[in-house]
């Protein structure tokens, strides 16, 4: 397999006080959320604290103390026991990946009544409304105001850049940015840095951004989330691949090849499926969109047993993505389709309406996706889709406000992994998961 450059290390953090509940430029097509101010009567309930095995070792969580009187044999026995417990703990938490660590965001306080500009990827999906809700609630708690904007479509990169420029001209205390493109915003980011305005990324990072311009990111570890989806998918597909006489095709639907979050969810899924299939002795290849073919770890090969077929529409529209789904469903060797966000998941449901090929039966095409919303939740519940990865969008919105406030205070900030969970019809009503499934 091709070697993949290591991604940025995300510092784990503790998120407390977050609870799931729920514009500027006249020349750009945009949706706008009104600025919000303090409301001292509102409180935020305490969230669940979860600690990663890696953070336990590096940051001193649950460290075991050893006395000098312990013999070498006792120490070795203790190490073996601790390692086994850590492995078991890691396995038990594999389906619920949430954040924890060294920065307690629940203790953030604003030194002044700051104003923030936040430029989102858009409002065309309920996901962004959930992020907005979290941001509004936390802004009210901290006594700061914000202006939350985004383009009408996640294809409107130029509109988003214009909104970012308008945000800079407003001279806020800090700016939140969910970048649609990993390079289109770089000039504006440099301008913000020169003006002394810190930028906090959310949902997507901005690889290649001018050094020091983006001070932190609040996002899911998207590559790891794609891997999680692949692991759960391969558990179901393993026997079908083994039983197939010829090649099998796994479709990968991405709404674009420009957003870091979408790309990494796709690559995480592709690379992990390839790793698992190759471990079982199968050959794997990737075809379709050039970006994913070139950036995946998979070496192209002829006559592969497992074909990962990546479909990306020319524009981010429901119609084009539904057509991509139908094209994949109509290929005789397709056994699965994975959609890497709410847009793609809903397009899968739409594309399947006339064909009725998605499902968990042996002669059906397995469907897995990302996020939630009414359409996806119902499709998982009724078996059209097997499962999905949910993020924590309300917690993400709150974390953005916390990081913006810390940056405006002049405090040290760090990346926040807002976590992800795998859900199916069997566990989607569990309290820990249901709180992250928005309508």
Segments (PLM) and residue ranges:
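A residue-level marker of the well-folded mature domains of exported/periplasmic proteins
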Residues: 2, 24-439
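Bacterial N-terminal signal peptides that target proteins for export
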Residues: 1-10
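C-terminal motif of bacterial Sec signal peptides marking the signal peptidase cleavage site
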Residues: 18-22
């Amino acid at each position: 397999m091709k070697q993949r450059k290591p991604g940025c290390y995300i510092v784990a953090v503790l998120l407390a006080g977050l609870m799931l509940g729920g514009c500027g430029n006249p020349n750009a097509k945009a949706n706008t959320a009104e600025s919000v101010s303090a409301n001292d009567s509102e409180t935020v309930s305490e969230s669940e604290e979860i600690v990663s095995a890696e953070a336990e070792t590096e940051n001193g969580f649950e460290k075991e103390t050893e006395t000098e009187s312990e013999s070498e044999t006792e120490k070795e026995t203790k190490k073996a026991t601790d390692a086994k417990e850590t492995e078991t703990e890691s396995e038990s938490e594999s389906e619920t990946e949430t954040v924890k660590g060294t920065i307690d965001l629940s203790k953030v306080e604003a030194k002044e009544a700051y104003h923030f500009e936040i430029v989102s990827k858009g409002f065309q999906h309920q996901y962004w409304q959930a992020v907005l809700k979290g941001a509004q609630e936390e802004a009210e708690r901290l006594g700061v105001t914000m202006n939350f904007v985004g383009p009408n479509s996640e294809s409107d990169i130029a509109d988003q850049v214009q909104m970012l420029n308008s945000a800079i001209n407003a001279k806020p205390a800090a700016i939140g940015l969910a970048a649609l493109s990993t390079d289109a915003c770089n000039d504006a980011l440099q301008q913000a840095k020169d003006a002394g305005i810190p930028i906090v990324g959310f949902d997507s990072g901005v690889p290649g951004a001018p050094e020091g311009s983006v001070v932190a990111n609040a996002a899911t570890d998207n590559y790891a989330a794609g891997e999680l989806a692949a692991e759960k998918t391969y558990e179901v597909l393993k026997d079908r691949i083994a039983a197939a006489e010829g090649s099998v095709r796994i479709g990968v639907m991405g709404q674009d090849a420009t957003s870091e979050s979408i790309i990494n969810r796709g690559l995480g899924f592709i690379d992990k499926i390839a790793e698992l299939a190759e471990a079982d002795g199968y050959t794997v290849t990737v075809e379709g969109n050039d970006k994913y073919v070139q950036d995946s770890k998979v070496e192209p090969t002829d006559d592969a047993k497992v074909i990962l077929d990546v479909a990306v529409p020319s524009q981010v529209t429901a119609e084009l993505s539904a057509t991509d789904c139908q094209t994949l469903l109509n290929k005789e060797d397709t056994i699965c389709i994975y959609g890497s966000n709410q847009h793609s998941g809903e397009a899968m449901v739409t594309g399947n309406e006339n064909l009725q090929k998605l499902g968990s039966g042996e002669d059906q095409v397995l469907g897995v996706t990302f996020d939630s919303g009414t359409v996806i939740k119902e499709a998982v519940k009724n078996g059209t889709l097997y499962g999905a990865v949910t993020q924590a969008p309300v917690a993400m919105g709150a974390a953005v406000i916390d990081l913006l406030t810390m940056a405006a205070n002049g405090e040290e900030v760090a990346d926040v992994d807002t976590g992800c969970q795998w859900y199916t019809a069997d566990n989607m009503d569990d309290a820990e998961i249901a709180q992250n499934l928005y309508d």
